[in-house]
Amino acid sequence: MAGPQMGGSAEDHPPRKRHAAEKQKKKTVIYTKCFEFESATQRPIDRQRYDENEDLSDVEEIVSVRGFSLEEKLRSQLYQGDFVHAMEGKDFNYEYVQREALRVPLIFREKDGLGIKMPDPDFTVRDVKLLVGSRRLVDVMDVNTQKGTEMSMSQFVRYYETPEAQRDKLYNVISLEFSHTKLEHLVKRPTVVDLVDWVDNMWPQHLKEKQTEATNAIAEMKYPKVKKYCLMSVKGCFTDFHIDFGGTSVWYHVFRGGKIFWLIPPTLHNLALYEEWVLSGKQSDIFLGDRVERCQRIELKQGYTFFIPSGWIHAVYTPVDSLVFGGNILHSFNVPMQLRIYEIEDRTRVQPKFRYPFYYEMCWYVLERYVYCVTQRSHLTQEYQRESMLIDAPRKPSIDGFSSDSWLEMEEEACDQQPQEEEEKDEEGEGRDRAPKPPTDGSTSPTSTPSEDQEALGKKPKAPALRFLKRTLSNESEESVKSTTLAVDYPKTPTGSPATEVSAKWTHLTEFELKGLKALVEKLESLPENKKCVPEGIEDPQALLEGVKNVLKEHADDDPSLAITGVPVVTWPKKTPKNRAVGRPKGKLGPASAVKLAANRTTAGARRRRTRCRKCEACLRTECGECHFCKDMKKFGGPGRMKQSCIMRQCIAPVLPHTAVCLVCGEAGKEDTVEEEEGKFNLMLMECSICNEIIHPGCLKIKESEGVVNDELPNCWECPKCNHAGKTGKQKRGPGFKYASNLPGSLLKEQKMNRDNKEGQEPAKRRSECEEAPRRRSDEHSKKVPPDGLLRRKSDDVHLRKKRKYEKPQELSGRKRASSLQTSPGSSSHLSPRPPLGSSLSPWWRSSLTYFQQQLKPGKEDKLFRKKRRSWKNAEDRMALANKPLRRFKQEPEDELPEAPPKTRESDHSRSSSPTAGPSTEGAEGPEEKKKVKMRRKRRLPNKELSRELSKELNHEIQRTENSLANENQQPIKSEPESEGEEPKRPPGICERPHRFSKGLNGTPRELRHQLGPSLRSPPRVISRPPPSVSPPKCIQMERHVIRPPPISPPPDSLPLDDGAAHVMHREVWMAVFSYLSHQDLCVCMRVCRTWNRWCCDKRLWTRIDLNHCKSITPLMLSGIIRRQPVSLDLSWTNISKKQLSWLINRLPGLRDLVLSGCSWIAVSALCSSSCPLLRTLDVQWVEGLKDAQMRDLLSPPTDNRPGQMDNRSKLRNIVELRLAGLDITDASLRLIIRHMPLLSKLHLSYCNHVTDQSINLLTAVGTTTRDSLTEINLSDCNKVTDQCLSFFKRCGNICHIDLRYCKQVTKEGCEQFIAEMSVSVQFGQVEEKLLQKLS
């Protein structure tokens, strides 16, 4: 069911004047109140009906002319009804609700006793901006013209703080729902509201916990997000009569300012009058309060709290600038009225996006919760019982958890895991104390036999895979379902709720609840099948309805007086809050690392932030003054908002703070008290990068495992406990790691030179060992099977803006199993299995690294090695790694086994996800070698920077390979192999340059790797992490540009069937069918088979891709865009980075329309390269930081031309439409546009405050290309443009559209004069005031 969007109707807007033509045609409209508390769902105004997906901001402006005097209605003595009851907060409790049912408006002059929490008295609109975010987009309505628009909070606050005399328009913020923002914690609802709200007491709790999106985007909404709103209105705003959406009740606290309400009771006669008034289209002529029998006007002053019951018709006026907090609720004590209002919305055809979200889904959950709480019989699915009902059960590993970034990803990744069998003996005792309860999966019934019951209890039936194809997928909670014993005969409904023990006492329901349940059952039964909206959590809707009917029958004679207990019948069991580190954001967590991190962080003792080492090059230098952090600093003239240190000063190796102590013994590090290396290590504090425990290695009691030291960060390792458990975590580095090599006189460069000099002293020794390595490896060739190991890298260099796409749990566990199968016969038995490789890497990164492994065909490695040896003779320093024993680390580079067998079994799955990582094997190793390992670790610990510099060059090569792989945009992404023995199909030309990839990913030729044998175990054994990578040979020239590989084979023309025959319909016929499907349906079709997967990715089906307002752009999205090769791409108002956009445009040569409005200039600057495609349309409206200097960079010819590319023209020379609204540009930018955009036809310059008449003179001057090419220009809200600009437009021979609306200095008379003067040659008309259009 569709729900509210970010937009909605305003609180205080006068109705529009109806056109005479509309009156004749009897067209009706409804303008809906959405997320408003004093104004409700239907906003009765008169407007021509438009498609619900149409952008209503383009509706022509209609000046409001009321048929009544608002001032008269404010003074009139006719509205003297006495509906509102004054109460004190202490009397407003749940017992009052059970007795009176919330049917009359209530006013509280003091908030004491209500349980309300509000911000400090000096809280202002500016503070709202700081807490919800200055860039948060809010829907704003122009009260006079009724035109809705979007503003950032920063823009609206500037308007709100403008003195009243200087406001040329009346703007009102509508629907700022601030749940899941920092403001949420400063505002608390009345206690009674929390007790009766369906969202809190009926909706599954785990879905609410999944909500992370602060806005009301329906695609990201996990529950009806209508709990807390902030309303900001200026003096003079007025909202005509309306009812709140869905029949919701409203709580309303006037924090600052005041309000005046007109109230009409929801009698059947008044509701009929209201519906007739809405459909009449005469709202602006008739004041509804004059049509009804009784109406009450009441004034709310600052500090008042107001409660509006369901269905009450009300209008609102704002006499003074006001700030109001409130919210909407559905509850169980006036359900018939709520349903009646929802039916009125149906009849008046209110748009879905302006209505209560998930309305009927909520009704189903209400019935289920009542049935469960009075009968202890649940109709939720097993999954939902585990997640929300919190029935005690053995804890499932958090690795089964799963989070999804968007609706599209959830559709593309169907979760096919099966529920685990959950039986434990220690549950039996507690099971006896519980009320008998049947299984909730509907597998048994009262009529089933005892043997069937026992069978049903003995093993839970597996839920079908389709059950998990949910619209909203959830993370596994801490607790899951507990199996209970089943009684053959159901007892009569006992009292109690999940939160309390079941007793023999009967639960009495109030007459209001019984009437509500009956109305809900009748309504849901009357709905057609396609409108029942049964939510995913309900197992059997028909059984639920029967259960409710039984409850109504049993409770028909309940005593109303005994039902008034002051205690809610329906509550969720109290959930113990998870401990969360202070300030930790509630981001989406992955299955393997992040979920465990949050749970284990509390065990880390006195864990603190790492601090500067104050010794590295970065710590000792001063600010650069050039990076975006420096430019933000106040001392460099910035606003000082980021509060970040200079990028070049970010510490390379931050250290543990001096307050850190051991979790076991509680003492600090004592490594300075001993001399020997092993003793030093046992006494130094080490922080685990997975569980974050800080501990002395000597204090650990685990003897049968090994720790893995992180050479990139001081005092950092993967502790033996996590390593033994197979847990995965990202390799940590200092924040300044990726900038270290850029520092002038960097120590990394010096160390590299020193290393070259030292290693150059032993060339003969290295050559002899290099010659022995191939012989050793060829002997082991027939019995070694390489695991698909990959190089693990910090995400800062390769991942796009640190976005991760975590793997599905079944893939993770599947690779673990595969890992154990791939262990070679010679591997040591004492080694623990390694965790799955790449669990924290993006699928695109994993697939690109898999590309390296596919470069080497079996049997060719010896030949390739001989070629490599010749090319490496001049780079002997690289050979030093050959005689170094490979150290084991968490995710081994490439593989440590000799070479691939003749035929490697690998599915296509390896292209899109991480391959498995087998355990490393170690050959024979004597005491001498072991001693060398320890001594080498002793040397390397203080020289961590060495490995960092060695990794940088190969990282570039890996990145380049990833880039080239990305161009295979039609490669299937089938996630499962067709058969186990199927060899992966490589695209043609994939091994054309095998010499570039013949060495291992850590820089060592694969033939030079040798295996280390088993050695005596020293508990706990600590092994240093090797350098992540080694630079490639100097003789290889690194390409700076993307090199596109040859195209892969075309998709098949027919669809193969199971019997080997081809389907009768060929590809082109299927493509014709696919062309009618939406993108969402295409994604579903892509999961059918490999052939459909390739067909559905045809670029003809994806000419336009729209990601506007997408909260995060992940690598998976980017790879999907590349694969589909769109012509038009909308990335407006996203947080895409420069690296991501550069990566995209390098691979989209056919892109023609690009929308980047609302992005940052840092991201848009990616277009200043020679790889920018020849765009036709470019939208950079409201790009932050885009001024004249940046426009010069954007329009000037690129300086990074490819070799042989001599074109010195701008890459934007083909632009036909350019949108620059809201930019701080001057005539200098317009001169560049004239020079570099000869084909420009449509130019949008609205809200550009520096555009003047002289700017128009430039655009239309003699000799300019724009004089003849310009057909449309938008100058709305350009306050410096006057009537004189119209005389310049007479020069343009092809001008057809001139938008001068809201230009203060442009007059209506000037426009009419322009039309008269142009009528000689061209007929122009004024479609709207100051909107000039050429008449055909």
Swiss-Prot record:
Compartments where found: Nucleus, Nucleolus; Nucleus; Chromosome
Positions with biased composition (Low complexity): 440-451, 819-843, 1014-1024
Domain of life: Eukaryota
A Pfam family hit: PHD_4
Annotated Polar residues bias: 961-971
Annotated spans, Disordered: 1-25, 410-465, 727-843, 855-1034
Regions of compositional bias (Basic and acidic residues) in chain numbering: 749-799, 902-911, 942-960
LRR repeat coordinates: 1093-1120, 1133-1154, 1156-1182, 1222-1247, 1248-1277, 1278-1302, 1303-1336
Cofactors demanded by this protein: Fe(2+)
Primary enzyme class: oxidoreductase
Biased composition (Acidic residues): 410-430
Modified residues annotated as Phosphothreonine in this record: T493
Principal localisation: nucleus
Catalytic activity: N(6),N(6)-dimethyl-L-lysyl(36)-[histone H3] + 2 2-oxoglutarate + 2 O2 = L-lysyl(36)-[histone H3] + 2 formaldehyde + 2 succinate + 2 CO2
A GO molecular-function annotation: histone H3K36me/H3K36me2 demethylase activity
Cofactor note: Binds 1 Fe(2+) ion per subunit.
Residue ranges of coiled coil: 943-971
Residues with PTM Phosphoserine: S57, S474, S477, S497, S951, S975, S979, S1018, S1031
Zn-finger segments (PHD-type): 659-725
Keywords per UniProt: Chromatin regulator, Chromosome, Coiled coil, Dioxygenase, DNA-binding, Iron, Isopeptide bond, Leucine-rich repeat, Metal-binding, Nucleus, Oxidoreductase, Phosphoprotein, Repeat, Repressor, RNA-binding, rRNA-binding, Transcription, Transcription regulation, Ubl conjugation, Ubl conjugation pathway, Zinc, Zinc-finger
Activity regulation as described: Histone demethylase activity is inhibited by fumarate.
Function: Histone demethylase that demethylates 'Lys-4' and 'Lys-36' of histone H3, thereby playing a central role in histone code. Preferentially demethylates trimethylated H3 'Lys-4' and dimethylated H3 'Lys-36' residue while it has weak or no activity for mono- and tri-methylated H3 'Lys-36'. Preferentially binds the transcribed region of ribosomal RNA and represses the transcription of ribosomal RNA genes which inhibits cell growth and proliferation. May also serve as a substrate-recognition component of the SCF (SKP1-CUL1-F-box protein)-type E3 ubiquitin ligase complex.
Family per similarity comment: Belongs to the JHDM1 histone demethylase family.
Domain notes: The LRR repeats are required for the interaction with the PCGF1-BCORL1 heterodimeric complex.
Protein name as annotated: Lysine-specific demethylase 2B
Gene it is expressed from: KDM2B
